[in-house]
Amino acid sequence: KCYMADTGLLISHAFDEKIIQGEELYQKIMLDKLEINSGMIVENIVAQMFVASGHRLYFYSNNSRTNADDRMEIDFLVEKPQLTNAHNICPVEVKSGKNYTTVSLNKFCKKFERQLFTPYIIHSQDLKIDNGIVFLPIYMTSLL
């Protein structure tokens, strides 16, 4: 995966100036009517926050053609500095929408449960814990 160090610059490069002018772009952002892959933008923001917090960026991807149970992608793997019973890897999924699934995270946790610490989903909603997964608002990313 490749992330841009400046998310603002990424957004400005994502639009052709001839298609959307400055004021129109800002209005669309403010009214949540922007036709863009918001998942890419939010994932880039999270990557930028992880780097600013001193984390190295790792991810997991398996595109198995033979076994659907092995097909999964995890946006980030965060290494915790302390070992707790040999579990110091936290899988992190980033979700930009209000409705989403956790299929990849669930498969990953089941497959690698012995090596994992706490799984996280970073999203635009409130903080909660459900079935052992911590759901963090985006603004709390730097606390990982």
For the regions a language model picked out, list residue spans one by one:
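Accessory nucleic acid-recognition modules appended to NTPase machines
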Residues: K1-I74, V78-T84
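A structural signal for isolated positions on well-ordered beta-strands in alpha/beta enzyme cores
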Residues: Y58, C90, T118-I121
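Short polar/acidic secondary-structure junctions
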Residues: P81-T84, G97, L127
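Domain-level recognition of nuclease-like catalytic cores that cleave nucleotide substrates
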Residues: I122-L144
